[in-house]
Amino acid sequence: MLQKNLLKEWWVWVIALMGLILWLSSCTKPETTLYVCKAGQHDFKPSPVPFPFAAKTLTGWALLDSSCWYNDLGEDTQDWNKLAGVYRWADVVKNKNSFILAWRPDPMRNVFQLCLYENIDGANRPHESAIYKVNANQGFSFWFAESNGEYILFVDGTFLGEQDNDKPFKTIGKISAWFGGNQTAPHDMSLQMDF
């Protein structure tokens, strides 16, 4: 029901159209930061301090390096890694109520799956019905479109999903890249991102 209401809103279509225009017209890579996760760690560094701010629409650009692909974690290979997102600042912790763009390796070498991933009252809720695939070293843009404390997610202009959580996100903090799931990074990984 929320999706039907959101898709009737003019601002959703304006943001989607702006995103499509930006994506089609982008000829150069934006200024990015290199994030590195060392083998045996979870956190990609540098790890920015998540200062609180009022909920708003956020845009970003990322590129997953071929070093991010792996297939040696057994059943944990299917866990979702976090790329970027927002969380409710009032909850203090990032994994209680959050709205995230997540990634994992595809079975095909050097291909990655992207999806919307939520934490709702501490429960993990990946939206696996809408998977977007990118190749290693292929840049992509993403948009966290916000209205009245609710978010929807687009990647390269493709709608990936909307917020299922009924708690409004009024004051938020940013979530940055994180490996896992249960396991830590099996080897050094790097990605580029502007968020």
Predicted region positions:
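Short, aromatic/His-centered strand-loop micro-motif at the edge of beta-sheets
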Residues: C115-S141
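Bacterial Sec-dependent N-terminal signal peptides
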Residues: L2, I21-H42
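Short tryptophan-centered beta-strand motifs in secreted/extracellular beta-sheet-rich domains
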Residues: Q138-E146, Y151-L153
